[in-house]
Amino acid sequence: HHNTDAFGDTAPQDICISSTYWMMGPAWLCTHFWTHYEYTGDREFLKKIFPVMLEAALFYLDFLVEKDGVLVMCPSVSPENTYRLPNGQQGAVSYGVTMDNQILRDLFSQCIKAGEILEGTDFSAHLKEMEVMENCGEFIDKIVDACGKLSPTQIGSDGRIKEWMEEYEECEPGHRHISHLYGLYPSRQISVDKTPELAEAAKKTLETRLRLGGGHTGWSRAWIINFYARLHDGESAYHNIELMLEQSTYSNLFDRHPPFQIDGNFGVVSGIAEMLLQSDEESVRLLPALPGAWKNGSVKGLRIAGGGSVSMEWKDGHLDRCVIEAGNPMKRVIRYGDTADEIMLASGKTEWNPVLC
């Protein structure tokens, strides 16, 4: 729930239906557990938090219902946003909202991966506490089945990512929330390399939202920087950094919502890192969204998925030197511009030069 507190208060908090009935907080928080494991490879940590992930999955498995051959959350809302019905009435509650599907796809797929990594570990006591009758493998099979039945991210007739299952008219077309692009960032479900059609639709979604007044809060502007970084659009990402500093930053450098919200500060730092380096379990992309304003520069110790870090130097807008320090041996495709070089990274430092590919 969006407002669960230390005292166990999980009741709807107020009359703002479009936020009060958002129930994806636990699933999103669980993805942070996985991200920590993904970047550290800490198996003991994964073993410790896996039961939490399973319990979150259990809740959503119980909550999902079938609609037109797919599993959907119902009731469901797109956080703080509303739509207009054909009769002119304003609505918020729906079913199978895009953000819900994307978050659940992350949670379920991460539970599946964690189950594979921890295969053979006994979680029977935890499952018994959860009142799950199956063994861990059988329960994971249920998650696999449900994950395959989630509605995919859809493109509307106007070429944008659909926010709701239905193509509703938006009450506020320039809304600060762009929740249906969760799949672009922080998730990796939408990418320029693997899902170009969805990436193009995400770009159009973003451009339309901004043209109509979006990005007017600091945290929203920070999210937009990350979106453009994932779209490999360094100039747009940099432009939004400028807007962030000009319009959404106090003199003490606190993010301006208004008032102060620290997620804007964290988000812009994340966006800058994403402009310089992006990675997943298969590849490492160097300088994916380098703007012209950063003609020369260097960065040290940016973390990569799988455990390790990257340090780089660039001159005149081109990569000059790259050192990858892997925490353990792993195969990765190193991407820079149009270059894609599959290499086996040994533990320790590896110097990579695109000229030698």
Model segments located where?
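Active-site core of glycosidic bond-cleaving carbohydrate-active enzymes
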Residues: T4-Y39, R43, K47, T98-S283, ...
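Non-catalytic C-terminal accessory modules of carbohydrate-active enzymes
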Residues: E235-L356
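Aromatic- and acidic-residue-enriched carbohydrate-binding clefts of CAZyme catalytic domains
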Residues: H2-I15, N81-V93
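Primarily short, surface-exposed interaction patches in extracytoplasmic proteins
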Residues: T35-A57, D62, E66, M73-P79, ...
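Acidic/histidine-rich catalytic neighborhood
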Residues: L54-A114
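Generic beta-strand/beta-sheet core signal
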Residues: N3, C74-S76, K315
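Structural beta-strand/beta-sheet cores of well-ordered domains, especially the beta-sheet scaffolds
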Residues: G25, A57, G69, V97, ...
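A glycine-rich phosphate-binding loop feature that marks nucleotide/adenosyl-phosphate handling sites
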Residues: S76, I143-S151, L287-W294
